[in-house]
Amino acid sequence: MGFNEQENAFIEWYPRGYGVGFRVKERLFETQTKYQRLELYETEGFGKLLVLDGTVQLVEMGEESYHEPLVHPVMLAHPNPRRVLIIGGGDGGTLREVLRHKTVEKAIMVEIDEMVIEVSRIYMNVARGAFEDPRAELIVSDGVEYLKNTDEKFDVIIVDSTDPVGPAKMLFSEGFFRNAYEKLNDNGLYITQAGSVYLFTNELLDAYRDMGKVFDEVHYFSFPVIGYASPWSFLVGVKGDINFRKVDLQRAKELKLYYYDPERHETLFQMPKYVRELLEKV
């Protein structure tokens, strides 16, 4: 796993020998932060590549293929999302997409690793001014602890974390889901990325099962994401009486999205028979 100097390539190896790779021009930056190994590459055809502990986090060209489905389905399904919490997302892409919604009055982003924010600010323009937006509040802290201790309440909670293995497993635990449920306002929505159903099957099913113990409804959908082992999975938790299968198309028109199509929101729930049967057994 990692950078191959002879091939001028970065390859991320997933379980069972599945790999996703990019030809790279150069390594722009690397460091060991307090929490993880951070690398940044310039690829031949996809812009900059952000890597944390050997795992691809962001591909600059096409990053909307991840950030749009993570943010807009829940934001458009909620009738009036005013207060939003983002856990993770240090590159700023999720914050950027959240702040495109005019209903948002406050968006709090909690990122544990300040170096991810700084490298993203210096080398990339993914945030596109989101960090400076007066509605945004950046907190450098552990998202698990923040959620446990905060008195704030939110309409939408978005978890933009690393894969559901290793240290990030805490973000996929029943206890974490319960804290999130408690910090949602009545009729709130929660979403997390959840890895590849084909390569992180057990981890995803565990999260789906534990969310089902906590939230009033749980929805699964997947989306092709550039740079990830697609299709990539997302899990949505509903608190109260919100129909996640219906989105506000009038608000959606103002966004001019590139990847996620609100007019075909219902297609998110069309999944392969294999996946549907897996979820039905949970």
Swiss-Prot record:
Gene Ontology MF annotations: spermidine synthase activity
Gene3D superfamilies, alphabetized: Spermidine synthase, tetramerisation domain, Vaccinia Virus protein VP39
Keywords annotated in UniProt: Cytoplasm, Polyamine biosynthesis, Spermidine biosynthesis, Transferase
SUPFAM superfamilies cross-referenced by the UniProt entry: S-adenosyl-L-methionine-dependent methyltransferases
Domain PABS residues, every copy: 11-239
Keyword Transferase: yes
E.C. no: 2.5.1.16
Binding-site positions, spermidine: 67, 91, 160-163
Keyword match Metal-binding: no
Name of the top EC class for this enzyme: transferase
Entry's localization field: Cytoplasm
Domain of life (superkingdom): Archaea
Known function: Catalyzes the irreversible transfer of a propylamine group from the amino donor S-adenosylmethioninamine (decarboxy-AdoMet) to putrescine (1,4-diaminobutane) to yield spermidine.
Subunit structure: Homodimer or homotetramer.
Name under which the protein is recorded: Polyamine aminopropyltransferase
Organism: Thermococcus onnurineus (strain NA1)
